[in-house]
């Protein structure tokens, strides 16, 4: 995934990744990309989502080469500081494109001594002092959380209403079930 300047390290990393996927996954590998928005991931102090995409390609390729039918199970968070409804709509589009029906999800829970909790509590990023939006009310949290479940017919009407509310942004790739 992360290419170093040392070819031996890169080779060792590839061998380790293949060994992990081919020999040490018992059907499902749970990973935590946590979000698709690079802006939100930056606040989380995590790498860009493209790195997860690269890993998924490697995972799928090794599964195909080894004749395996394993699943990659991603874990995502809604209502994280910096996350808005538009980010969650985009998350729905991306996870649909990747053919994920999300189940491993959670709303952000503030925990002591973290950058995210500081931003959530104060409304400012502690390092940059830039304002940071945080969903705090039940309505704001549900407005974000529903996008995890774009594939559920019972969520269709609420998601469409939320897309209309957030404005002119087009999410034409998010074809909801009827």
Name each model feature, range by range.
Residues 1-73, 77-81:
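Conserved SAM/AdoMet-binding glycine-rich loop
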Residues 82-95:
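Catalytic cores of alpha/beta
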Residues 105:
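Active-site-adjacent helix-turn-beta-strand microarchitecture at beta-sheet edges
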Residues 109-114:
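Short, solvent-exposed turn/loop segments enriched in Gly/Ser/Thr/Pro and often Arg
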Residues 128-170:
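Alpha/beta catalytic cores of nucleotide-metabolism and tRNA/nucleoside-modifying enzymes
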Residues 172-178:
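Conserved small/polar residues in nucleotide/adenosyl-binding loops
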